[in-house]
Amino acid sequence: MKIFHTVEEVVQWRTQELRETRFRETIGFVPTMGCLHSGHASLISQSVKENTYTVVSIFVNPSQFAPTEDLDNYPRTLPDDIKLLESLKVDVLFAPNAHVMYPQGIPLDIEEQKGPFVSVLGLSEKLEGKTRPNFFRGVATVVTKLFNIVMADVAYFGQKDIQQFIVLQCMVDELFVNTRLQMMPIVRNNNGLALSSRNKYLCPESLKISENLYRGLKAAENAIRRLAPGGRLSRSEIIDTVTQIWAPYVDSHDFKIDYVSLADFKTLDELSDVENTSEQQPIVISCAVYVTDREKPDTVVRLIDNIVI
């Protein structure tokens, strides 16, 4: 596996490899912030399976962190990440520093930032964007830069960050980016907990409790799938189905609900009801919940999850 730290190295590699194969080969790309786990591995394995070359980037992107968020404490596990990537037969790791990606610097205060940035208006302000107002501006900007550097045929993203995928799909479509996006299913443990780099902050007991996030979403999905033809469930009925599962953990202060959403898959517009008809468009039930660690009550971890129907 080749490890590159500059744009010039990636461009030179890409030009040389494709020239030798007369541009008949494909490049798959998996952008990450490191601290890789089995969820990332599933994306990478899919790329290796489907493409001639696979490029993975590891870059902890400052522009998607707010001044109140602790960029310095984001987990960085590069030596372990490299071992995993080598075992997965990745061709190139691109691991730039912040100066490479943001030549004018990247202060966390948006008012002090200079240079070009990408905003996807209308989608970025919803759900995650309410809690993290400039998060998707940072994501869209860094992904645009990475797409321009790698020039991959296809890029792989996990369903767990579904709003990110929807925002980036809009960006790719409307900025005419020549990279296809592919969303891969959420990787879960045996009891349904979505794998996340944040899980490592929780003790085993709190991780076990967190498995109820998926139980709540799954209960809502089952209620929808049981609808008879022409049947209808209101928004409140669906969301109540979710929160009833979580109620004991809210009462015990293990969970603090940020949001539960019932939305159109493409627009993320909130739905008033769901009807079992052929005209019903795909929907996404998503959530964000703050989980307080039982061993270290000062540790609060925000977990997200979703189900697409």
UniProtKB/Swiss-Prot annotation:
GO terms for cellular component: cytoplasm; nucleus. Pathway: Cofactor biosynthesis; (R)-pantothenate biosynthesis; (R)-pantothenate from (R)-pantoate and beta-alanine: step 1/1. It catalyses: (R)-pantoate + beta-alanine + ATP = (R)-pantothenate + AMP + diphosphate + H(+). InterPro entries: Pantoate_ligase, Pantoate_ligase_C, Rossmann-like_a/b/a_fold. Its EC number is 6.3.2.1. CDD domains: PanC. Required for pantothenic acid biosynthesis. HAMAP family: PanC. Present with 2400 molecules/cell in log phase SD medium. This is Pantoate--beta-alanine ligase. The gene is PAN6.
